[in-house]
């Protein structure tokens, strides 16, 4: 079976890519097509929606953080037993950072690398024929990135659709569908993006409504034929992050949700066993595990409950006496001494590290990061370089007394200083690791 693939891109965030992608995934799945979803860039939330829409795990591909051979390997894995791959772009299609060619982090990099056409989603609210100038720009901006077709989104009426369609088709781009404006299709959001699929109270009915809208509005047969057959080498896992232990105690509940699908998949494929536990249910890490991993998530929304989880706190403290504990972002916040929530209430955390964080005065920290590990750790040896990102609103209000976990640089290599902390067997940082550097 040869899979076909197409990238779903747009001029900017907020154009409706996610709703269109989720709806198309479910619509094709309902037709019996073996369809899979991929999200470009560092995004934990959208792959969860892709998984709910298809019943199969999602995946992230990031051309800045992942070396080309790792991209090929992960993409090849996702195409196994699949007929159609829909790749949802982050932000605008060409948006990335100004670094080496095809390593910018943009979805356009993947279009070039994999020779995949783009389905351009245009939010035409507030315009009509002018949408054709945007489509024209996309069609001619980069000769190595092919615009396969256009989908109009948030049109106000059939007349509005006709005006936009006629103008765009005059420049030689087919319009394969038009989704009319419908507030009921909007997905709820919060400070780190969309409310996660697992927390959406009516997720399946909502995805079905999106699928109904796509079935009604988009020519699915034409879209399938526009997707390009995938034919590429299998790549390599050399740049993948190795399992941090043989048995990994993984915090997994509404407060700890951000573990990239490719990491979980690779760790299991490498022979590691993941043993989940729930701090919110006052569960401690299994003492038979080799390492405890606290991923990112939303501990600030559950700070009071975590502070009261005496069994969890005692268990992880006992675990950390002899075995490694690592926390990323939200997990790092919980490893500190205290966490101040949005209302200014201070909650005692585990105290395994000495810092304190606050969500009361929010400041967005966002961007690609290169982390040089300061000392041997579960993520690598001293001097090893990892690529990943930060995305959080919390601030460190007391840096504590611990040694840094890593020395950080931004996506262009500019130094940002020390990051995180380490003490004994415990380490943590706001940095989310994606892959080995290089």
UniProtKB/Swiss-Prot annotation:
Query: What would you give as a GO molecular function for this chain, any one?
Result: ATP binding
> Do you know which SUPFAM superfamilies this protein is assigned to?
Class I glutamine amidotransferase-like (SSF52317), P-loop containing nucleoside triphosphate hydrolases (SSF52540)
- Using the record for this protein, list the coiled-coil segments as residue ranges, or answer none: none
The chemistry this enzyme catalyses reads: hydrogenobyrinate + 2 L-glutamine + 2 ATP + 2 H2O = hydrogenobyrinate a,c-diamide + 2 L-glutamate + 2 ADP + 2 phosphate + 2 H(+)
Q: What is its EC number?
A: 6.3.5.9
**Single Gene Ontology BP annotation:** cobalamin biosynthetic process
Keyword line: ATP-binding, Cobalamin biosynthesis, Glutamine amidotransferase, Ligase, Magnesium, Nucleotide-binding
**In the UniProt record, does the keyword Nucleotide-binding occur?**
yes
Primary enzyme class:
ligase
- The active-site annotation reads 329
Record-annotated GATase cobBQ-type domain positions: 247-438
Record InterPro entries: CbiA/CobB_synth, Class_I_gatase-like, CobQ/CobB/MinD/ParA_Nub-bd_dom, GATase_3, P-loop_NTPase
Q: Which domain of life is it from?
A: Bacteria
- Quick one: which pathway? Cofactor biosynthesis; adenosylcobalamin biosynthesis; cob(II)yrinate a,c-diamide from precorrin-2 (aerobic route): step 9/10
Q: Any other noteworthy remark?
A: The a and c carboxylates of hydrogenobyrinate are activated for nucleophilic attack via formation of a phosphorylated intermediate by ATP. CobB catalyzes first the amidation of the c-carboxylate, and then that of the a-carboxylate.
Q: State the protein's purpose.
A: Catalyzes the ATP-dependent amidation of the two carboxylate groups at positions a and c of hydrogenobyrinate, using either L-glutamine or ammonia as the nitrogen source.
Q: What is this protein called?
A: Hydrogenobyrinate a,c-diamide synthase
Q: Which organism is it from?
A: Agrobacterium fabrum (strain C58 / ATCC 33970)
